[in-house]
Regions:
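Electrostatic, structured charged patches in enzyme active sites and in nucleic-acid/phosphate-binding
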Residues: 1-100
């Protein structure tokens, strides 16, 4: 099982606002010790590329994907922020010890 939150971006919020949302997720992690993935889904790969710059270096694991990559959210479309690894399935972003 993969535990995650998904943020569906419609391109209406500033990139700074997207980054600010991670503060609440970090507070959840600090209060509970539970560290789910936070997945941002973007309307375009261009918006995804821009957002990845402000979503880096956070306390919570963040991954991004975008429309137009072929397979949709269930496919090999997710990029872990802060990693140089290629796009992967969501399940492949979870360390093996955290899978259930």
């Amino acid at each position: 099982m993969v535990e995650f939150f998904i943020e569906v971006d419609r391109g209406t919020e500033t990139l700074a606002r997207l980054a600010d949302k991670l503060t609440g997720y970090a507070e959840l992690v600090n209060a509970t010790g539970w560290t789910p993935l936070v997945c941002f889904w973007f309307p375009t790969t261009g918006r995804e590329t821009e957002a990845r710059q402000v979503l880096a270096h956070r306390e919570v694991p963040v991954t991004t994907g975008a429309n137009g990559l072929g397979d949709g959210p269930g496919g090999v479309v997710w990029l872990q922020v802060g990693s140089t690894a290629p796009r992967r399935h969501l399940i492949d972003l979870v360390p093996a010890g955290r899978r259930s």
